[in-house]
Structure formats: C-alpha cells, structure tokens
From Swiss-Prot:
This is Antimicrobial peptide Meucin-49-1. Antimicrobial peptide. The keyword Secreted applies. Amphipathic and cationic peptide with an alpha-helical structure. It comes from the Eukaryota.
C-alpha cells in the first residue's frame, strides 16, 4: 500500500475512534425517548393499558351481554 492510502485509513480510523469515544448513551436514550415514534408508541400503550384496566375492573358488563345464539338452519 502506498503512503497516501495508509494516511487516509489512519485519518478515517481516528475520526471513527473520536466519534465512538464522544458517544454518550444517555443522550442517545433521551433522543429516542423524545422522538415522534416513541411518543406514538407510548400513547398507544397507555390507551391499551387503560382499556385493559377497564375490562379487568368491570368484567360484569361483558358477562351481562348475552352471546348471540346461532340460528338453526332449515333444510
């Protein structure tokens, strides 16, 4: 390999090492938590949890509703 290629590889490696060393996991998690997708997922999760809690707390409403009886077919 010639010296120019080795120099480029060295510089790129140093840039990558600098990025990895400056990476903070806490800021990454904070950025993910504030993202639009995370907000949508949290809202959907809260809605599902609320629905589940309502079903668990008031199961008599579901039991009071009679199940539809299938009509017998005539031949």
């Amino acid at each position: 390999m010639n010296k120019k290629i080795l120099l480029v590889i060295f510089i790129v490696t140093m840039l990558i090492v600098d990025e990895v060393n400056s990476f903070e996991f806490g800021s990454f998690i904070k950025r993910m938590w504030r993202s639009k997708l995370a907000k949508k997922l949290r809202a959907k999760g809260k809605e599902l949890l609320r629905d589940y809690a309502n079903r668990v707390l008031s199961p008599e409403e579901e039991a009071a509703a009679p199940a539809p009886v299938p009509a017998k077919r005539r031949r």
